[in-house]
Design a protein with these regions (language model features):
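Short, conserved beta-strand element in jelly-roll/cupin
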Residues: 84-96, 104, 111-116, 162-163
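His/acidic/aromatic-lined binding-pocket segments of jelly-roll/cupin-type domains
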Residues: 87-90, 127-128, 135-136
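Conserved short histidine dyad/triad with adjacent acidic residue
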Residues: 64-82, 92, 96-106
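Short alpha-helix capping/helix-loop boundary micro-motifs
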Residues: 84, 120-125
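A short hydrophobic beta-strand segment most commonly corresponding to one strand
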Residues: 135-137, 153-166
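Short proline/glycine-enriched turn/loop segments at secondary-structure junctions
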Residues: 148-152
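Conserved metal-binding segment of the jelly-roll/cupin
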Residues: 130-147
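A short, N-terminal "cap"/entry segment at the start of jelly-roll beta-barrel domains
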Residues: 6-65, 73-81
């Protein structure tokens, strides 16, 4: 959702989390060259067998993280947020419940780690199940978290692109 507010002569556009299917990714290319490049990387590469780890895609601009994980229960849900990067999360196998909250609703649990571009927060979240072929885009105005999906008893393969804010 895009919200536009007018303040006299200043226009402020706030973009919030996006969830969609990968076949619709080109709709979001206009949001930035880095997002378009990350989506093109998904489209042009087989990511099903690549080893878990961190891969530079474009030096200092786009990094790809590959995760294979078995879901675990959590008693305490914490949210994460970033200041310098947009997260594109793409599901290849398994499903997760992803929590979202606007940054304004957070309580920082520890000092923000500038070096890792990571803040650990508590916030009331809304949850959506994401499945293979789906992606979520989280902007610096968004908090997000992944929790166990009780309906899915399988491992999850997820690709996360860290796209430097342009």
């Amino acid at each position: 959702m895009i919200v536009k507010k007018q303040f006299q002569t200043l226009s402020l556009i706030i973009i919030q989390m996006i969830i969609d299917r990968i076949e619709n990714a080109s709709r979001y290319y206009a949001l930035g060259n880095g997002l378009a490049q990350a989506f093109e990387h998904i489209k042009n590469n087989d990511l099903t067998e690549i080893a878990p780890g961190s891969y530079p895609i474009i030096r200092d601009k786009i990094r790809m993280l590959v995760f294979d994980s078995k879901q675990t229960n959590t008693d305490r849900i914490t949210m994460e947020g970033h200041r310098k990067n947009i997260d594109i999360q793409y599901w290849i196998r398994g499903s997760e419940l992803m929590g979202y909250a606007p940054l304004l609703s957070h309580n920082l649990l520890e000092p923000f780690n500038e070096e890792k571009d990571f803040g650990n927060c508590s916030a009331d979240a809304s949850f959506t199940r994401l499945e293979p072929g789906m992606f979520a885009i989280y902007f610096p105005t968004d908090l997000h978290t992944a929790v166990i999906d009780e309906k899915c008893n399988s491992s999850v393969r997820k690709i996360v692109f860290k796209v430097c804010v342009e």
